[in-house]
């Protein structure tokens, strides 16, 4: 290559094309000037665009290695507190949720206590203990019978053997002692707040405790499969010996036990006046779906006016009789039986 020189000679300049001369001057100018830092960085970026990508991958790999070395330290994620998180904290402060009460479980616990007492042969009477076990077995049989047959079949069964009904109620009373509360007390308080001389039908009354408590304030008629005392009228709950529209209030307190629930609700509607109240109290664990159960009753000619749960164990419902009946056998009127496990 020859030495670089400027084109200053006029003769030389005449023989060199103008376009080529301009390119040569620009090249000489750039070669003599020092490039700026920004220009050099731009050139580096153009020449090595893969460098940043390699650095990012290396940083990610280093973070992953650090995380594997310290697995106990979770990554710190800063997020705004949601309402669901606050609700969860509140629930934790309240403590563990109460278990739903089931009569069959309470009955099993009662029998376990009896077994513990029987474990001491020096104090327990073997004959009395054998009788107690026999009565417990008969109670389980009678309880299952009531939940798995119709009201008319149960009425005929106890009509032939009234002593079986006494044994059942004695066993039921023993189970009630283990319950944390009883909805019957709530119903009695509710009746005491009502105006005097209401016509009240207590269906499946047992020993007619409502008539005993508020019999002077209201006109109480107590019905059950067997009359255990003078206050009770024996009958089938689906065929009440009463006229149409003769009751202001009809009560089913833990007494919807047969398989023909539709007949029981229809009979309650028949004897109620328009605007009369149907009061139902049942064990919460028996409901397949509380919503569907209430909707089924409303379709049978009622309007729901009140519903609440009593200490997670019992459900209290209140309906008013209306004129229109949408369906005679609507879907959803189902209750699970309370069956006590055999031991």
From Swiss-Prot:
Top-level EC class as recorded in UniProt: transferase
Alphabetical UniProt keywords: Chromatin regulator, Methyltransferase, Nucleus, Repressor, rRNA processing, S-adenosyl-L-methionine, Transcription, Transcription regulation, Transferase
Sequence segments annotated as region (Disordered): 1-123
Binding site for S-adenosyl-L-methionine: 169, 204, 224, 236-237, 253
Official protein name in the record: Ribosomal RNA-processing protein 8
Composition bias, Basic residues: 45-59, 89-101
Task performed by this protein: Probable methyltransferase required to silence rDNA. Involved in regulation of antisense ribosomal siRNA production. Required for the N1-methyladenosine modification of 26S rRNAs.
Pfam families, alphabetized: Methyltransf_8 (PF05148)
Statement: the UniProt record of this protein carries the keyword Coiled coil: no
Subcellular localization, as worded in the UniProt entry: Nucleus, Nucleolus
Any single GO BP term: rDNA heterochromatin formation
GO molecular function, one term: methylated histone binding
Enzyme Commission number: 2.1.1.-
GO CC, one annotated term: rDNA heterochromatin
């Amino acid at each position: 290559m020859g030495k670089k020189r400027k084109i200053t000679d006029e003769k030389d300049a005449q023989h060199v094309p103008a376009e080529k001369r301009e390119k040569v001057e620009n090249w000489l100018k750039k070669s003599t000037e020092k490039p700026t830092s920004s220009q050099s960085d731009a050139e580096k970026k153009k020449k090595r665009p893969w460098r940043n990508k390699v650095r990012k991958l290396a940083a990610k790999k280093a973070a992953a290695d650090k995380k594997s070395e310290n697995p106990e330290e979770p990554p710190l994620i800063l997020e705004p507190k949601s309402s669901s998180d606050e609700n969860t904290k509140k629930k934790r402060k309240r403590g563990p949720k109460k278990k739903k009460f089931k009569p069959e479980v309470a009955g099993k616990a009662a029998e376990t206590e009896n077994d513990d007492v029987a474990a001491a042969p020096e104090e327990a009477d073997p004959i009395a203990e054998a009788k107690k076990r026999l009565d417990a077995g008969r109670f389980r049989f009678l309880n299952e019978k009531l939940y798995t047959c119709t009201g008319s079949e149960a009425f005929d069964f106890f009509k032939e053997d009234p002593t079986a009904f006494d044994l059942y109620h004695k066993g039921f009373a023993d189970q009630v002692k283990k319950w944390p509360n009883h909805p019957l007390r709530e119903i009695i308080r509710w009746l005491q707040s009502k105006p005097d001389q209401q016509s009240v039908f207590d269906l499946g009354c047992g020993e007619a405790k409502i008539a005993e408590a508020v019999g002077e304030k209201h006109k109480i008629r107590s019905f059950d499969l067997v009359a255990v005392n003078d206050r009770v009228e024996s009958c089938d709950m689906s065929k009440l010996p009463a006229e149409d529209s003769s009751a202001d209030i009809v009560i089913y307190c833990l007494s919807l036990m047969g398989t023909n629930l539709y007949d029981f609700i229809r009979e309650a509607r028949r004897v109620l006046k328009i605007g009369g109240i149907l009061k139902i109290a049942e064990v919460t664990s028996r409901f397949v779906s509380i919503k569907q159960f209430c909707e089924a009753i409303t379709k049978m000619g009622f309007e729901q006016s009140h519903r609440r749960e009593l200490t997670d164990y019992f459900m209290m419902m209140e309906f008013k009789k209306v004129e229109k009946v949408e369906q005679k056998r609507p879907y959803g009127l189902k209750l699970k039986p309370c069956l006590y496990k055999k031991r």
